[in-house]
Amino acid sequence: MFVDQVKIYVKGGDGGNGMVAFRREKYVPKGGPAGGDGGKGGDVVFVVDEGLRTLMDFRYQRHFKAPRGEHGMSKNQHGKNAEDLIVKVPPGTVVIDDETKEVIADLTEHGQRFVVAKGGRGGRGNTRFATASNPAPEIAENGEPGQERYVTLELKLLADVGLVGFPSVGKSTLLSVVSAAKPKIADYHFTTIVPNLGVVETEDGRSFVMADLPGLIEGAHQGVGLGHQFLRHIERTRVIVHVIDMAAIEGRDPYEDYVVINEELKQYNLRLTERPQIIVANKMDMPNAEEHLQQFKQKLNEDVPIFPISAVTRQGIRELLFAIADLLETTPEFPLYPQEEEAIHRVVYKLEKEEAPFHITRDDDGTFILSGEKIEKLFKMTDFSREESVRRFARQLRSLGVDDALRARGAKDGDIVKLLNYEFEFVD
């Protein structure tokens, strides 16, 4: 069964670190700062590729991390921006944020792009921090961390071709012969409970996805048997291959089978009958099959191409696959229900509260815990190996109101404050 839902991890590249450097060339007195900025980290970008049909590739790789930007260099040389990480997805992929459960992208058109995780900006070099009062700063920023998240990919497209017919007419056998699919095969009804899918390739290199759908019986549109499950899957196919047991092994009239199945498709959704249909007369290697085929053609009384085959002996399979591939090339996709004449476009606006720059909680041992996206980003972009950077970080905390908030929570001189995996001593 093809994968149609998968959870993956994506992370944009971190920005490159800024550089602390000074000009030291001969004959350049008081050269001043010369540290370049870091380069931007790469984005993780989903790009729709119409050549892909499934999410199978994501079963083997579920972590995608874009490269980080190059670090800044001396002589005011900026680091190189990192290249984006391109991840190809099939048309019809829906991207859902795993934390909020919101749909963040619906990717349908070939070449459509969506940045799922943005890369961080490069850290500023010490040239950026030069002021009249501090013309030679020993301070630079680390690169901004890239965005990271878990997302769920869902693929609603099932197949190009759907095999329909009464139970045990040979649909599963046909699929197993023309593709690498391994459906459950037996001569009792409803062996196929869920759709089996297989990729079919013709001798001239064309390929398509074929679905062996659960068996259909009279009354399916009312939920009898496996009706609704079957019909929901066939809604998505572009070409219907109607398989008929021409040997009449079950004792039913092949023409009656044909009429009943088409009536069920018509009852469920009018648009199903608009799809092109190929009639396949299966089990032609069995006794009386040829006689039944002639009777079927007389009753049908239409100039409709019928492909006599035997899934077991592979008689007629090659011609059938070529006909399906030819039909797919000229068949567009079908909307599930009739289109409204005038589409109404709605835009949803949401009021999003501005997130607080930090939160303070307290552990059982009395340690104060600082958290929050903004304060954690400031921390990660601070170079703690340089005293000026540490002093700047302390000023940033004060300007955000962290010191006052800690005092209000009862923090005293010498108390431990924890941010991420690092501990500091509170100095009042």
UniProtKB/Swiss-Prot annotation:
Binding site for Mg(2+): S172, T192
Tree of life domain: Bacteria
A single GO cellular-component term on record: cytoplasm
Cofactor dependency: Mg(2+)
EC number(s) on file: 3.6.5.-
Domain called OCT: residue spans: 350-428
CDD domains in alphabetical order: Obg (cd01898)
Keywords: Cytoplasm, GTP-binding, Hydrolase, Magnesium, Metal-binding, Nucleotide-binding
Record-annotated Obg domain positions: 1-158
Residue ranges annotated for the OBG-type G domain, each copy included: 159-329
Subcellular location: Cytoplasm
Transferase keyword on record: no
Residues binding GTP: 165-172, 190-194, 212-215, 282-285, 310-312
InterPro entries tied to this protein: G_OBG (IPR031167), GTP-bd (IPR006073), GTP-bd_Obg/CgtA (IPR014100), GTP-bd_prot_GTP1/OBG_C_sf (IPR036346), GTP1-OBG_CS (IPR006074), GTP1_OBG_dom (IPR006169), GTP1_OBG_dom_sf (IPR036726), OBG_GTPase (IPR045086)
Matches recorded under Pfam families: DUF1967, GTP1_OBG, MMR_HSR1
Known partners and oligomeric status: Monomer.
PANTHER family the UniProt entry points to: DEVELOPMENTALLY REGULATED GTP-BINDING PROTEIN-RELATED (PTHR11702), MITOCHONDRIAL RIBOSOME-ASSOCIATED GTPASE 2 (PTHR11702:SF31)
Function: An essential GTPase which binds GTP, GDP and possibly (p)ppGpp with moderate affinity, with high nucleotide exchange rates and a fairly low GTP hydrolysis rate. Plays a role in control of the cell cycle, stress response, ribosome biogenesis and in those bacteria that undergo differentiation, in morphogenesis control.
Stated family: Belongs to the TRAFAC class OBG-HflX-like GTPase superfamily. OBG GTPase family.
Protein name stated in the entry: GTPase Obg
